[in-house]
Amino acid sequence: MPRFQRLEHGADSKSSIAVMSELNLILLGPPGAGKGTQAARLTEDFHLPYIATGDMLRGAVKEGTPLGKQAKEYMDRGDLVPDDVIIRMILDCMESPDCADGLLLDGYPRNVEQAEALEKAMKGKGRGVTATILIDVPDEEVVKRISGRRLCQKNGHVYNVFSDPPKHDDVCDQDGSRLVQREDDAEDVVRKRLSVYHEQTAPLIEYYEDRGVLKRFDGLRSPTEVHDHIRATIATLRLEDEL
């Protein structure tokens, strides 16, 4: 059986978005949902490369690739890197031998327009989205997870004043240095990030739900429980595709 089927031009998008046995996964969820933790485990489970678009951009710029040079021109001007440049980078990654069995994409798409452009580009390469993994976490829990985070100034040990507090307020248990809150972790900043996330992601969730590839997971469960649920779901998808 071939590793994946070619997508037919003109096929209905709802029926053609996930027809391949390779695993092309998109990771969605609010800040603080634990996406990084789950990504690390899933890439080991299914031997998939993890593509975080921010890291991908920085790596391309550092290596001086043609697309990296293009991206740098926009970044140096303080402009957003256009979607077509980012999508071409993603497609380049897909062409590498490491991505022969699929990939795990985090940080893109962020809105429906980007999702449509990515789908069209992948379709042109005979590929599609197998599943979009959404880790759901309520806003107030996100605020607690992020605004409660404290780092020690000396060695960067991490605490959370709500779920994993130090023995003494604002003092690291391990080296006695002062604990501080990063500016990005302040509650007002977190709430602004959540507002942007919901504005962008609500239509994106509906987009993938309409295509039958959205899989929801309860981010209030322990990281191990979330991982077990995601792994079982993806394993079932792979098994169904091979039948």
Predicted region positions:
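Glycine-rich phosphate-binding loop of ATP-dependent small-molecule kinases
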Residues: P2-L243
